[in-house]
């Protein structure tokens, strides 16, 4: 991975410029005489730096004494802090996350996913109410403030600007994290995974370019999306025989287009198939696996169902949505025939994209599909049903136990993770990937069964806001949230070897 970004100033350059042409007392002249750096002796430069460091420390100590974080002292660098909500697994026995036994063969891990909003995608007309909160020099500090406050152990970021990669690397390293970043060569932003380097060590990494992979060696991408998945494997440190124990972490950002349901369904198959392939290697036998990111999908839509249900059955309006998306024709620009620009939501405002007979509603109640469109949908559904892995949404399976008024429908997911100017809802998820055991999983699995089957215990969740709690204006906004997305974080306890979760109850 290329960690260098053009146009950045090195620490030595910053240090050099910080003393150049500044006011400083002189031994031979009056105080506050402006002396060029070239005229200062080494001892004078050293003295100036020491005085400045002392002043900075005095300011920091003053802020700390006031109960403020000295790195984020002003109101514009604050955000709405959300509490951690622990699960009480068994009220009758008085067990809480603090009293559930932690053994040498278990590890607590806080998992976060966060779409940080790429600065290169921001257009003022898309964020008319955000004002100065859109400026990177402020927003970036708030994003780091969030990470410092919530302290995840593994974090997957989407929409990370390549030209700000040094910023992310430096700040994650200050927090004790190692990072890996990948992007499609046609995009200005990409995916980043960071991990606590006291708990984990990188083992391997894979990148999937969805556009260049045939699903089932047959079904190609219908348009150029430039979407990818980044998958890594991490060894656990401090666990007995750690060489055989770790986690597989997949970070992805699926196609955004309103008529992109079929493509998102195809991309979700590709990332699940790759995780299944990795897990089939003897080296990764028994490793826990997670898939997270921005799926641009709501819980009632086909891609979410394809990740979480076996067998996948599409019928009625759900199937109509997929077939309708197949009938949509993308522009020549998006397909790469006329432009090499980074096509995003901000670049395609028209629904018709030049065709007068385009579908107008991406979620029709019914749709008259062609024979070929029906066959293609059937083929993709069959591919999903051929998989031996599926996802369990960590929020979906247990969030209702800690925040029931914000756990919605049969899926149990919170109401939102995106609060934008034109749309609000849930798009982001953290899935635990488990074997499907050839069982019918269309009905939601009980939490205790999930934990026992997978040697995992859910400890708690970062609280998600309800729609009623959100301001009328969109995000980001000063003092509220630094992105139009809201981060999700779940703490889980992973068990290894012969230790079983149910034996601890």
Curated annotation (Swiss-Prot):
N-terminal signal peptide: none
InterPro entries attached to this UniProt entry: CCR4/nocturin_mRNA_transcr (IPR050410), Endo/exonu/phosph_ase_sf (IPR036691), Endo/exonuclease/phosphatase (IPR005135)
EC number: 3.1.-.-
Bias (Acidic residues): 338-347
Pfam family, one: Exo_endo_phos
Biological process terms in GO annotation: polyadenylation-dependent RNA catabolic process
Skewed-composition ranges (Basic and acidic residues): 36-54
Family: Belongs to the CCR4/nocturin family.
Protein's recorded name: Probable RNA exonuclease NGL3
Organism: Saccharomyces cerevisiae (strain ATCC 204508 / S288c) (Baker's yeast)
